[in-house]
């Protein structure tokens, strides 16, 4: 639920599902949590005179998560759009180090939940594009706090309407 969902949102909006917004925001915040953790750990480790191994680990974990999400998106498209066979997908998963049992579980999940990972990644890309628009439109008035507040106060929505709302916000302040 958004910060203003109960008081300022048209009731009809509560009937719609905005998977791209919800999962995109979730993945966006997951990614910045890795960045914040790496920054804090680098500062702490720097004061100890070490070479930042924990900060590097955070960066590697973020990249591993990116690879996982991207791989699952590609496999989802391969299965549901291009019609790839189960054996092809299992072979791909196993080539990335998953066991046969893990590969079967991932395959079953992808088969029964089409486009689930696309909501995460495409929503994340849209969230980043929206942030870049906010940086350009708000210029010196941009801050992550302001952007995050804008997204949360807008509440679940499609990205076209979020972009329109962003332009209205920029017009009011600019």
Residue ranges of predicted features:
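N-terminal maturation segment of proteins
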Residues: 1-174
């Amino acid at each position: 639920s958004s910060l203003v969902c109960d008081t300022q949102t048209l009731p009809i909006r509560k009937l719609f599902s905005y998977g791209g917004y919800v999962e995109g925001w979730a993945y966006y915040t997951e990614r910045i949590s890795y960045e914040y953790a790496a920054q804090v750990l680098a500062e702490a480790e720097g004061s100890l005179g070490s070479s930042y191994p924990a900060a590097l680990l955070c960066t590697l974990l973020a990249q591993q998560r990116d690879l996982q999400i991207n791989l699952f998106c590609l496999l989802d498209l391969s299965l549901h759009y291009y019609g790839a066979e189960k054996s092809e997908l299992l072979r791909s998963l196993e080539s990335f180090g998953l066991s046969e049992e893990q590969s079967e579980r991932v395959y079953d999940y992808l088969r029964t939940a089409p486009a689930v990972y696309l909501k995460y990644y495409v929503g994340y890309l849209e969230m980043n594009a929206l942030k870049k628009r906010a940086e350009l439109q708000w210029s010196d008035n941009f801050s992550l706090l302001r952007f995050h507040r804008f997204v949360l106060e807008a509440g679940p929505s499609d990205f076209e309407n979020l972009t329109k709302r962003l332009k209205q916000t920029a017009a009011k302040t600019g």
